[in-house]
Amino acid sequence: MPEQALLEEVVDKVRPLLGQGKVANYIPALANVDAGKLGIAVTTIDGETIGAGDYLEPFSIQSISKVFSLTLALTLYEETEIWSRVGKEPSGHSFNSLVQVELERGKPRNPFINAGALVIADLLQSRLGAPKHRMLELVRALSQNDKVCFDKQVADSEYQHSARNAAIAYLMKSFGNFQGDVDTVLRTYFHYCALKMNCADLSRAMLYLANRGKTLDGTELISQVQTRQLNALLATSGLYDGAGEFAYRVGMPGKSGVGGGIIAVIPGELSVCVWSPELDNQGNSLAGTAMLEHLSQRLGRSIF
């Protein structure tokens, strides 16, 4: 288990990087976040959580939610039903690319770009009567925090700026790879992205990725094989176009969001969440990546 002093050291180490990135500004609710925030939390497979910095302050998890939605889909569908509609390959294009959807005839490259996450949301909408409520139940149980909620302001703001995601959904629908009502699925998708959680919540919630699919209370959420496969996808596609750089520097499966959060895992040991709202050119937390790099170096841990 990393010691408290190490996490404090990690936060202090990256503080000089503040001011070098840019906060996401495509919706006001994200643009107004204090850019100077820094937080880190670690949860070990024995269930202990420690943190440093602003690790208890909630933030918009954005694309980190795509890990939860894919996990939920894996509990509801046969794997062939999922992977016949979305691929497992890195994208190489922007996370909201229309060009790639067109070129690949409506099948997204992976579940962590917007097109892929929209297909997963479409699957959940088709199978669940109340997909937003089911997601909230899941993340509250995983994080052991009943106060986790959706930020309605963020969800509404995302919906008001939804033209590109709607275009992606309709393009996939034209190829027969989107079954539900586009507007309904978009509203569900934006609620997922608008989940508010803190670093401690997320490090606890993602522990199943480090613990062979078992949650904090020992329940098997997904199988050991599915967990290994999900971690492989996170290692290759979890950081937008920065996945290779992240693997090189950090050496952990991870998933980022434009709210400035990144989750990562060391299988068999721990899950970690960092948060710093300023992003690099790939849309990943600049100081957050540096925190994870420093942590992995100090722990001497990497999956490679």
Curated annotation (Swiss-Prot):
Its EC number is 3.5.1.2. It comes from the Bacteria. GO terms for biological process: glutamate biosynthetic process; glutamine catabolic process. It comes from Shewanella sp. (strain ANA-3). The keyword Hydrolase applies. The gene is glsA. It catalyses: L-glutamine + H2O = L-glutamate + NH4(+). This is Glutaminase. Homotetramer. One of its GO terms (molecular function) is glutaminase activity. InterPro entries: Beta-lactam/transpept-like, Glutaminase. Substrate binds at residues 63, 114, 158, 165, 189, 240, 258. Keywords: Hydrolase. The lineage of its organism: Bacteria, Pseudomonadati, Pseudomonadota, Gammaproteobacteria, Alteromonadales. Belongs to the glutaminase family. PANTHER family: GLUTAMINASE. Pfam families: Glutaminase (PF04960).
